[in-house]
């Protein structure tokens, strides 16, 4: 069993570069199945989710070359075969294969997706959209069968009952090679959706409106190869910004797009965090007094649900009482009992996280229960006095590229060990 060991209390300084966006690349890779030639992605993060996706692509017949942060995929050998259940079950973003396989073959046999357990986030919205496009859905054991019965998937007018990044991307991908026009209303607006649309348009797709709540896709017959730069990971950027404010004495975070983090930065400024926004970087100063605030997550451009857990340790450093309300994933509270083990004055009351600061954290044995909870525990361990041991770290490695090396370069006493 692998663990992360942190000896906390050391102030961090220096520069850290943000990697390519996890939430983009897990959709970009499956979308490449639609291409009729080689596609190259630059800025691909070195995370285990990418490794899993590459393995799935190779099992399906794609030729893959991965060097540094450049990923080259030739999808021409991809075959219409049942997808490997084990990998699918461990990877929530595996549902992005639904749209690309339907777009290319008109059918797919897939296992139900896994990933972090954050409460209800069903794929019903995806399936409702597919059914509107002529897809029949059936189940056999742990597999789901999607089929157009030999017909070409067709365009449709689709209204998303709930704003959903995954369903928006999946529908957009499926519609790219559909017959006719597809309109998605109440679409999610996240930057990652724009990134996927940019890749597809560079391949020859006709997608308009990505980043707004109405997306229009005119289906095309062929998509050529291209080269695409993955956008920076706004969640990783926010994690390092919060970490720098919590335990830094001058940290510069580079490869940052400020416009993707405006709501997050606004809440930090409300706390009193001192930082300087540069063209593609943010410099976070050593902090003095901070004020407790209330956080309420909402769809983009609101405060990202993926950032409420990584921000929590910094909130524990603030003076006063505050609350965290996650309107997206109600079960995103599993980091709370782990922080309590470290001495945090924090609890869950009526579905809301309530904290009282400042809390003095001490090292403890804790468990990462999901990706962003794991990030919160890393920051808390760096803040704490003494030794912190984090288990279940596979969640952390799913989404944070080279996290041990990046933090070590900032002066952290952190290591990954095999037990």
UniProtKB/Swiss-Prot annotation:
Instruction: Offer one example of a GO biological process linked to this entry.
Output: UDP-N-acetylgalactosamine biosynthetic process
- The primary location reported for this protein is cytoplasm
What's the protein called, per UniProt? UDP-N-acetylglucosamine 1-carboxyvinyltransferase 2
What top-level class of enzyme does the UniProt entry assign? transferase
Q: Pfam family of this protein, just one?
A: EPSP_synthase
Tell me the residue numbers annotated for binding UDP-N-acetyl-alpha-D-glucosamine. 92, 121-125, 306, 328
**Active-site residues, as the UniProt record annotates them:** 116 (proton donor)
Q: Give the originating organism.
A: Streptococcus pyogenes serotype M3 (strain ATCC BAA-595 / MGAS315)
> A GO CC term?
cytoplasm
What is the similarity comment for this entry? Belongs to the EPSP synthase family. MurA subfamily.
Where in or outside the cell is it found? Answer: Cytoplasm
Q: Pathway listed for it?
A: Cell wall biogenesis; peptidoglycan biosynthesis
Tell me which domain of life the UniProt entry assigns to the organism this sequence originates from.
Bacteria
Residues binding phosphoenolpyruvate, per UniProt: 22-23
InterPro entries of this UniProt entry? Enolpyruvate_Tfrase_dom (IPR001986), Enolpyruvate_Tfrase_sf (IPR036968), MurA_subfamily (IPR050068), RNA3'P_cycl/enolpyr_Trfase_a/b (IPR013792), UDP_GlcNAc_COvinyl_MurA (IPR005750)
Q: What does this protein do?
A: Cell wall formation. Adds enolpyruvyl to UDP-N-acetylglucosamine.
Tell me its EC number(s), please. 2.5.1.7
Reactions catalysed, as given in the entry? phosphoenolpyruvate + UDP-N-acetyl-alpha-D-glucosamine = UDP-N-acetyl-3-O-(1-carboxyvinyl)-alpha-D-glucosamine + phosphate
